Structures are given as C-alpha cells and as structure tokens.
Amino acid sequence: MRLRNIPRANDVIAASPLVIQDPKAQRGLWQNVFGNDHPIHIEVGMGKGRFITDLAKKHPEINYIGIERYTSVLLRAVEKLQGKEQPEDGAEQQENTRQDIPENLYFICMDATELPEVFAPGEVDRIYLNFSDPWPKDRHAKRRLPSRQFLARYDQILDKNGTIEFKTDNRGLFDFALEEIEPAGWRLLMHTFDLHADMELMKDNIMTEYEEKFASKGNPICKLIIDRERR
C-alpha cells in the first residue's frame, strides 16, 4: 500500500513532546523517561493510535509506547491526541491541554527491526500487534510482524514472563502466526478465530480503528496470546 506523503509530518513529529526523538538513547532508561517503575507495554504498528491511547487512559498504572514507522500515519495520532487534527468539515479546531493527554504514553517513529536497539533485555512486559501488514508474498514472510524473525527480536526485549497479543482479520496471516510459534520457541496461551463471538474475551477488549471497521462488515477477528517456553 502506497501511503500519501504529508509535507508537514516530519516537522510536527519532530516538535511533538509526545514523540521520543532519540529512542536509542533511552535504551535501559525508559523508567527515567516515565519517571516511575511501572510495567511497559508497547504496540508495534500503532497506526492512528486509538488502541494504545485508550489503553493508556484506562490503565494509568502501566506505561505505554506506540511504535509506528510511517510519519504520515504517526502524524494522525499525534495531531488527534494534541487536538490539532486537520478538520474535514471546516469545523474549528480545539487544542487539547496537557491534562487531556495521558502522562503514561509516548510514541516512537521507527522500524520494528530496531527494537533491540531501543529496549534493553527484559525492559518490556507486553507487546501488542494489531492488524499488521500481512505481506502476502512468500518472499516477504520474514517481514511479517508475527514471523519467527520478529519473534526473535521480541525475545530480546521482553521480560521473562512477558507476553505478546496479536489480533487480525486476515486468516492467512493468523494461520501463519500459529505455525511460527512452536518453531520459534514460544508457547500458545490462547487463541480464537472469532473474538467478537466470545463475550468473556470481549469484556476487556479495546478495539482499533481497523477492528471496528472489519467487525462492522462481519469479518471474524482472530486473536492469540503467546509467551516463551520456560528455559
């Protein structure tokens, strides 16, 4: 998918206090960034940021970091949270105050391949992967976020009891993820091929923009949770 280039994206992101500008310099020091020792949960491929923003508002006892590689996508999350999103109907903009923005939330603009350079071993307690790019061509399999190549990267930064939660409406990508778990040395804790049909699982479910869109069309949403096999 070709993303539209937005000229102001780089400048807005560079000036935003929500975006960590030199994340590699914070490796092993993220507790200092947040000013506390709360658990750290990250979302890789956060898109427009609704999921992780809602989580941060709901759970002030947890620190959240949203990761997005595309500036044009991250721009939407930043401007929405700061109350500066460009209105589509000519309505007057209202800028949010700092009190409206969760203090336990930051964003990073980076490629997920760099995760071990940004987080020290054991520094992250949970990773969320939501509606990731399926990279449908076989030669691109290693680019898929639930691939064994990426599982090896997550292994380097997760706490020993850390978990990964993955949601998608793409059954092919979900089946691929299920096949990668055991060979990569991970353990499947739960999975469902129709999340929204399970009322118990839906109690604490926070939907992404894509999830809401796909579910409204009747597309089944798949979800799994994994951790590493005890070593």
Stretches with model-predicted labels:
Residues 177-179, 184-231:
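Class I S-adenosyl-L-methionine
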Residues 117-126, 131:
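A short acidic, Gly/Pro-enriched loop at the edge of an enzyme's catalytic core
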Residues 70:
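Conserved SAM/SAH-binding beta-strand->alpha-helix loop
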Residues 1-42, 50-57, 79-121:
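S-adenosyl-L-methionine
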Residues 161-168:
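Conserved beta-strand signature within the Rossmann-like core of class I S-adenosyl-L-methionine
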Residues 146-160:
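A short glycine-rich, Lys/Arg-flanked "PGG" loop and its adjoining helix->strand segment in the class I
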Residues 47:
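Conserved glycine-rich SAM-binding loop
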